[in-house]
């Protein structure tokens, strides 16, 4: 089974050799590497050219003007010839048996995609306190998960994704303007409605956090980053529903079911709203990714914070009636 590996690169020359060599070192050797340099201004072209000279039968370089991740994915997919297409960020690294493991799944099941999580490393390849991208255990019916949670994010990043080519042909090309970043989300959400997706409970790669990538945690997000994230969720939701119309899928994704989105919107308004408090509380109590203990904890925390909005509202009301 031939695997096409698409690597989108923009100014990651310092990490690129590690990424590409981790593919060349795979125990599954029937591969091609389509490396799309998206208008880099560092020495990425030199790095790619040198590596391609060392493995000309494996590496297909594409150099293009900057279009963002979506445009790079489009170019990479158009050049890919494998039965399965796997994605790798230019700053991440695969473990040697990663492709062999996903090939086993594709050859022994009818799933259209395979995902897995990643260990987390820093810019110097040091593992960060045994951290990983592990999330909730997901069923193969990702479409139901997405519909139930209003497209809440609970998936591995780019370097943990692989799909059968014939399925991606129904998704690509993607809109390069809307998906300049987070294009992996477009792929995950769209393919979920085209067949079963297997999520392996194994960390088969390393996800690098180094300050220059788009990694953002809820704890460290600024108000500007939160607003950008919320806008991204809204765009994603519209894109998914447009895609569902195109493929003739009956259901639509309802953003009001997305706990993360809805709770953040409420916090941003900072105003007491009984109807919204009730709605969000119900979402917390039924959230499929929380344990019973977590539901109790997050409900208490939400109500405590909402109570502050209520007190603030009461104070404001009194001050305006004096």
UniProtKB/Swiss-Prot annotation:
A GO biological-process term: biosynthetic process
Record InterPro entries: Glyco_trans_2-like, Nucleotide-diphossugar_trans
Superkingdom assignment: Bacteria
Record keyword Glycosyltransferase present: yes
GO molecular function: hexosyltransferase activity
Enzyme Commission code(s) on record: 2.4.-.-
Keyword Glycosyltransferase: yes
Signal peptide (UniProt feature, chain positions): none
Keywords: Glycosyltransferase, Transferase
Protein family according to the UniProt entry: Belongs to the glycosyltransferase 2 family.
PANTHER family reported in the protein's UniProt record: GLYCOSYLTRANSFERASE, UDP-GLCNAC:BETAGAL BETA-1,3-N-ACETYLGLUCOSAMINYLTRANSFERASE-LIKE PROTEIN 1
Name of the protein in question: Uncharacterized glycosyltransferase alr2836
Originating organism: Nostoc sp. (strain PCC 7120 / SAG 25.82 / UTEX 2576)
């Amino acid at each position: 089974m031939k695997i096409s590996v698409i690597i989108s690169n923009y100014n990651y020359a310092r990490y690129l050799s590690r990424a590409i060599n981790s593919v060349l070192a795979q125990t599954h050797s029937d591969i091609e590497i389509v490396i799309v340099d998206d208008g880099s201004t560092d020495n990425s072209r030199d790095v790619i050219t040198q590596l391609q000279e060392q493995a000309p039968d494996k590496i297909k370089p594409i150099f293009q003007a900057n279009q963002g991740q979506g445009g790079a994915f489009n170019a990479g997919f158009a050049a890919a010839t494998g039965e399965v297409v796997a994605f790798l960020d230019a700053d991440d690294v695969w473990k040697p048996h990663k492709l062999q493991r996903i090939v086993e799944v594709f050859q022994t099941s009818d799933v259209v995609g395979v995902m897995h999580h990643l260990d987390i490393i820093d810019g110097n390849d040091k593992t960060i306190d045994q951290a990983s991208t592990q999330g909730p255990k997901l069923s193969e019916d990702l479409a139901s998960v997405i519909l139930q949670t209003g497209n809440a994010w609970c998936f591995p990043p780019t370097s943990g994704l692989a799909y059968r080519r014939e399925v991606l042909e129904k998704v690509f090309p993607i809109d390069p303007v809307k998906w300049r970043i987070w294009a992996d989300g477009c792929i995950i959400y769209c393919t979920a409605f085209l067949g079963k997706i297997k999520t392996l409970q194994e960390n088969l790669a390393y996800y690098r956090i180094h300050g220059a990538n788009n990694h953002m945690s809820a704890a460290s997000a600024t108000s500007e980053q939160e607003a950008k994230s919320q806008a991204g969720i809204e765009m994603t939701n519209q894109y998914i529903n447009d895609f569902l119309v195109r493929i003739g899928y009956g259901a639509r994704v309802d953003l009001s079911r997305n706990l993360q989105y809805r709770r953040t919107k409420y916090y941003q308004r900072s105003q007491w709203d009984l109807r919204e408090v009730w709605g969000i509380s119900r979402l917390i109590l039924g959230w499929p990714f929380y344990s019973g203990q977590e539901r109790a904890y997050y409900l208490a925390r939400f109500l405590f914070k909402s109570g502050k909005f209520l007190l603030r509202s009461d104070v404001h009301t009194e001050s305006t009636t004096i």
